[in-house]
Amino acid sequence: MKTPIELKILDSRIGSEFPLPAYATLGSAGMDLRAMIDTTMTIAPGETQLIPTGIAIHVADPGLAAVILPRSGLGHKHGIVLGNLVGLIDSDYQGPLMVSCWNRSNSPFTLDIGDRLAQLVFVPVVQAQFKLVDEFDSSDRGEGGFGHSGTK
């Protein structure tokens, strides 16, 4: 099932020099976002840069949100991850999509124009309404926190 999402092109190279975000395979969950920078840039070790993607989206449906996630190869091979770890795009946001790019490695990382930098995934949203209680019904876990369930 495909849900229509409004997309605005902010950089004219998208759709001409570089393709619109799209799913690479039938099983893909995310669409690649590209670095729509004006010139090749180097991100120094420990540095964070905000990178434009050249697009804006409007999800519009309050039952959906978008998340910007890292591409696994960049983090594993080069130490390039998202500065905010996950970018959450609310359904009513209409501004440009930007990627906070953090070089957590000890080596400079060169980013070329149009490089695939992150991925965009759409997820369902449930808006909760809190019900105030004095006590919770008991559960198997109870108040056990970090590491409570073990490692094996």
UniProtKB/Swiss-Prot annotation:
A single GO BP term for this record reads: dUMP biosynthetic process
Specify the pathway.
Pyrimidine metabolism; dUMP biosynthesis; dUMP from dCTP (dUTP route): step 2/2
Report any Pfam family annotated for this entry.
Answer: dUTPase
Enzyme Commission number(s) of this protein: 3.6.1.23
Instruction: List keywords of the entry alphabetically.
Output: Hydrolase, Magnesium, Metal-binding, Nucleotide metabolism
- Binding-site positions, substrate: 71-73, 84, 88-90, 98
Q: Out of the domains of life, which is the source?
A: Bacteria
Provide the reaction this enzyme catalyses. dUTP + H2O = dUMP + diphosphate + H(+)
What are the protein's GO molecular function terms? Answer: dUTP diphosphatase activity; magnesium ion binding
Look up the coiled coil feature and give its residue ranges. none
* Cofactor(s) required, per the database record: Mg(2+)
Which family does this protein fall into? Belongs to the dUTPase family.
Please explain the role this protein plays, according to its UniProt record.
This enzyme is involved in nucleotide metabolism: it produces dUMP, the immediate precursor of thymidine nucleotides and it decreases the intracellular concentration of dUTP so that uracil cannot be incorporated into DNA.
Q: Could you tell me what this protein is called? A: Deoxyuridine 5'-triphosphate nucleotidohydrolase
